Amino acid sequence: MTNTQQPLGTGFTAASTAADVLAGIDLSGRDVVVTAGHVGLGLETTRALSAAGASVVVGARSPARAAAALAGIERVEAYPLDLMDPSSIEAFAARYLDSGRALHVLVNNAGIMGGELVRDARGYESQFATNHLGHFQLTLGLLPALRAAGGARVVSVSSWGHHLSDIRWDDPHFDSGDYDGMIGYGQSKTANVLFAVELDRRWAEDGIRGYALHPGGIVTTNLAPWLTEEDWRTMGLVDDTGQPVIDPARDMKTPQQGASTTAFAASSPLLADIGGVYLQDNDIAPLEPFTEPVRQDIAAGPLETTVGVMPYAVDQEAAQRLWALSEKLTA
């Protein structure tokens, strides 16, 4: 496997904010879509890209709630989007294409994490359906607009959580039982990276580049509402008063810091001729020196992450295999 995971030495750090990486970058005239761009990291991403001049369409299950959250941000609107509902995804893509706009940046940001087993109407495990398959269908639906941009980027917000599981090729939907929500999350985050790898291989000649990234650990996003404050404290992510611990060097970030790598992937000229890579802390992350998934027990103590991507998440053959599986599952 050719190792494309070579850090660039960008000059940015884990403490850099979205405003830092966008300084001096003018996104005027650029059209962007951000899924769940009205909450958590998505909201910070929308705010930062808009401040740089971009026009943003936010995909949200409740456009009214999204509009309230987005009040005061310029050049932004919300379309209804439910990533577990194929008809909703199709309608979103059709509405965007009907607008006649090109699409310069697609940020596949929405995600869910852990919890009990939930299935969509097709019987698919909800995290794989939402975090990967929904975005896969959406991206393919928006392909004409991406091509029309004459140079576009598809940014998939993955996670260090991809270290928790490779793709469960024989049972991606846990039909055999023994469900583990964090394994399901890890699988979906690995899928995000593999999707970026194969998308870039397929579409780079059309000027469409793919990126995946780990934003960092951000407690305030409400990504996992099933976790209690005690769980967060055990993982070392909140202090004794319940306040988030902010320590970028240990991957504990503010929302503004967490949105920085998304903004970097969406806009940095340093990535102009690079794609199909996994980013972390506003740079290309190195390959991890180990190959087996990490076992994490929330109750075992402070969560420790590393700077790097698992080899199985950037394997080109696996990426092609996942694309074929995804086409089958979304047909």
Could you tell me what each predicted segment is?
Residues 116-130, 177-179:
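Short alpha-helical oligomerization interface
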Residues 117, 128-139, 155, 188:
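Short alpha-helix in the Rossmann-fold core of NAD(P)-dependent oxidoreductases
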